[in-house]
Amino acid sequence: NPRYGILLCINGTGIMNSWIRRNVTQETLDYAEMNRLAASVPAGSEGLSVVPFGNGAERMLCNRCPRAGIIGLDLNRHTTAHILRATQEGIAYSFRYGIDIMRGLGVRPDVIRAGAANLFLSPLFRQTLSMLTGARIELFNTDGALGAARGAALGAGYYKTRGEAFAALRRLEVVEPAEADR
């Protein structure tokens, strides 16, 4: 009995955030400080946008390589904080684009379950993503690598049930989409 699933892979997101850290902040800020600084800027980054597709072919874009970009930069207004927020917003919008593709295939993701790691450590990113997708986000005490390993072990028959595979995980936080922000 074969099973099929849908994977949303946004190839450029993680590297976009680390590229910004290396090249814009010159690694003077850790990710927690980047998150705090990003949150100091209003939603929409005062017209600054970041397109996070700069790490090769994007599966959800039919394997095209659209590249990354910083759009709308006003040298008299925008600061590092604006770039940091625009980066998180751009990644959240790319995630939304992928969710829209999934919805077009008949999948209705009402809940996003993620490990409490990487960009999901940013309250700004979590709330923005939840608001853009209309999905509840549930954070668990894991990360993507361990989640993938559990999924592979389940598929290989190491675990008998999905419940068994994920039994050790604890839900740490739930983020609901803020209706007022939609």
What are these regions (language model features)?
Residues N1-R182:
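Glycine/Thr-rich phosphate-binding loops that ligate phosphate moieties of nucleotide
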